[in-house]
């Protein structure tokens, strides 16, 4: 595509764990895929680094089998190897912006590489100590982006350049009002995701439940599945360990609702948004980012406990599934996310765009943060 007159030269460093786009798991990789695709469509000059088996146009510097080391004892060594390859490949090139998605290691290298006057970094995980302490050491030099207001609120003194909600791939098919009666939770099998509570809701609501996701590869994850999930599997509680592509899309679009009884403050729920853009409303506990993502009565219902979730399941017929999809697609499409990142690239900050009213504290923190200098397109 022909470059726009005001095109920026952008280097995007994706995580090294999964391909772009991911073939199954890989939420951060999906976001990077959607972002760089849309940036190129808009005429920007984009260089992307990622893992093997990625789409054309990605410089592949991480071995495919490294995905097995994610979160394991070799995690740090694999990430360091990948980042060394990335910055060797960059060489003496100059960019307007480096946008890092890899974590604090990649952010440090981007800041000290001198390859771009502006370094943008998306915080994809939970913003807790000691991560917040690290970010406070560099937040005046990097443009930090949070993926939700609730994530940013965990470190209210941290300078945040913008709240940019993640995007999902929009279904090609138009939303339909027809569906089946089952509930679905698409998530890793782990106590944090609350699948044991989803089972309780399904039983009490008289609805079949589908659990789709890999068992977390930890001792606690395996024990959780063996003790609290596996004994309840039956024709009314089905388990799909590997879902992706058309099978995943079909299961989501045919469900009466997605159910997410989360037991932690998840900074952003991609699976919830995937449900909503398909026209499938979401039932979720009020925690983390769920009040920002779900518009009660339009794209789903928020609940305080299991009893509330059961009651909400009885009101699903009140949701207009076509309207649910329309609202979600407008808010969480790739173009909207990309425009907000471009605002951060150019101006150094972007207006906060919450669905629910944020706390006065976080609004004050975000409103008083100064904009960073605007990068000028580099000569090519």
Short names for language-model regions:
Residues 1-380:
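Catalytic cores of nucleotide-sugar-dependent glycosyltransferases that transfer UDP/GDP/TDP-activated
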């Amino acid at each position: 595509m022909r470059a726009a007159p005001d095109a920026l030269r952008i280097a995007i460093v994706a995580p090294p764990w999964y391909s772009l786009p991911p073939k199954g798991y890989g939420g951060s990789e999906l976001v990077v895929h959607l972002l760089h695709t849309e940036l190129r469509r808009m005429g920007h000059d984009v260089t992307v680094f990622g893992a093997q088996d990625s789409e054309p146009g990605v410089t592949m510097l991480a071995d495919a089998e490294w995905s097995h080391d994610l979160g394991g004892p070799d995690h740090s060594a694999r990430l360091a190897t990948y980042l060394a390859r990335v910055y060797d490949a960059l060489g003496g090139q100059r960019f307007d912006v480096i946008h890092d998605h890899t974590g604090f290691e990649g952010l440090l290298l981007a800041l000290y590489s001198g390859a771009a006057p502006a370094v943008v970094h998306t915080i994809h995980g939970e913003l807790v100590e000691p991560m917040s302490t690290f970010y406070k050491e560099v937040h005046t030099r990097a443009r930090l982006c949070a993926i939700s207001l609730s994530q940013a609120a965990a470190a209210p003194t941290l300078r945040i350049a913008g709240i940019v909600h993640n995007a999902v791939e929009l279904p090609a098919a138009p939303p339909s009002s027809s569906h089946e009666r089952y509930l679905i939770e698409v998530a890793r099998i782990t106590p944090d995701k609350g699948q044991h509570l989803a089972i309780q809701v399904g039983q009490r609501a008289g609805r079949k439940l589908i659990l789709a996701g890999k068992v977390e590869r930890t001792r606690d994850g395996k024990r959780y599945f063996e003790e609290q999930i596996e004994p309840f599997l039956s024709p009314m509680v089905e388990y799909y360990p590997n879902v992706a592509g058309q099978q995943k899309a079909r299961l989501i679009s045919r469900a009466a609702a997605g159910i997410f009884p989360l037991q932690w403050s998840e900074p952003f729920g991609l699976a919830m948004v995937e449900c909503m853009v398909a026209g499938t409303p979401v039932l979720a506990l009020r925690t983390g980012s769920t009040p920002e993502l779900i518009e009660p009565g339009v794209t789903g219902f928020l609940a305080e406990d299991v009893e509330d979730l059961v009651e909400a399941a009885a009101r699903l017929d009140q949701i207009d599934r076509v309207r649910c999809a329309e609202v979600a697609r407008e808010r969480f499409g790739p173009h909207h996310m990309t425009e907000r990142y471009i605002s951060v690239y150019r101006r150094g900050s972007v207006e906060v765009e919450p669905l629910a009213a944020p706390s006065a504290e976080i609004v004050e923190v975000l409103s008083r943060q100064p904009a960073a200098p605007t990068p000028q397109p580099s000569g090519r």
